[in-house]
Design a protein with these regions (language model features):
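A residue-level marker of the well-folded mature domains of exported/periplasmic proteins
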Residues: 1-260
Length: 260
């Protein structure tokens, strides 16, 4: 309605957003959803879905859990909206590694629903802490959203458990501030994925302007931080805002400048 040429969309609600995507595409707007799969078909409902390798993230988390908990673990997994493709695929990834029954998934299945909302994440995690006397590992695909709830472990007289998650400066600094008082609080992160949208924007702009379309159609990132591996230290930048993602290609300083 406003005459835009290209639209990049994070369809966090999944298939519920498909009609809106299709409407934009049929109106001639270059339409590029990214990250969460909205269903539908490229060339029919939108131009291209730019995904991410969430299965690989899950495998990375699974390998880390297996290495650090060889005797098994009780695992609590938190993701976004119910049924979102990101959480489902991540679960498939780490379950492909954690095949032994000694690795027990607790909480709602296949994951605790948080809508990636920090307030709801805090409510969900607080309830889980009260319900489960043993939580060995928390898996979260939006790690920074849990920072407000993690102190509930200490209030209950328990160490914050090990955590595999997506990165964020606020999470890294929380770990730095609390690791000494919480002996079980190991942390491994994968990139939160700011560069996933970078690739989606590159596709949208190229297609709308007749430019060179990128050859990559999906984004993936390696393990970013691992408190058990000196080669991948947890990186807290107290001189920068907490809401930054140091795994991104854009520097923390440039991100901070954009947020002013």
């Amino acid at each position: 309605a406003k005459g835009i040429d290209a639209l990049v969309v994070f369809p966090d609600a999944g298939p519920a957003m498909l009609p809106a995507l299709r409407s934009a595409y049929e109106a001639g707007v270059v339409t590029v959803p990214y990250r969460v799969f909205p269903d539908g078909e490229a060339g029919v409902d939108y131009d291209l879905w730019v995904g991410a390798d969430f299965f690989a993230d899950g495998v990375s988390w699974g390998n880390w859990i297996k290495a650090n908990f060889p005797d098994g673990a009780k695992i609590l997994f938190l993701s976004g909206p119910a049924g979102n493709s990101q959480g489902v695929t991540e679960r498939e990834g780490f379950e492909s590694v954690l095949t032994d029954a000694k690795y027990e998934m607790i909480g709602e299945q296949p994951f605790e629903v948080t809508n990636w909302d920090p307030a709801l994440s805090q409510t969900v995690l607080t309830a889980a802490i009260a319900k489960y006397p043993q939580i060995d590992v928390i898996v979260s695909d939006f790690g920074p959203s849990l920072v407000g709830a993690l102190p509930e472990f200490q209030k209950a007289g328990r160490s914050i458990p090990a955590m595999t998650a997506s990165d964020g400066n606020v999470l890294a600094c929380f770990w730095e501030d609390n690791k000494d008082a919480n002996p079980d609080f190991k942390l491994m992160t994968v990139p939160t994925g700011n560069d996933n949208v970078r690739l989606a924007v590159q596709h949208a702009v190229a297609r709308a302007t007749g430019g060179v379309v990128p050859t990559e159609t999906a984004w993936s990132g390696p393990v970013f931080e691992d408190s058990t591996d000196p080669a991948k230290p947890v990186t807290c930048r107290t001189d920068l805002p907490g809401g930054l993602y140091l795994s991104a290609e854009m520097s923390g300083e440039d991100q901070a400048e954009l947020l002013k």
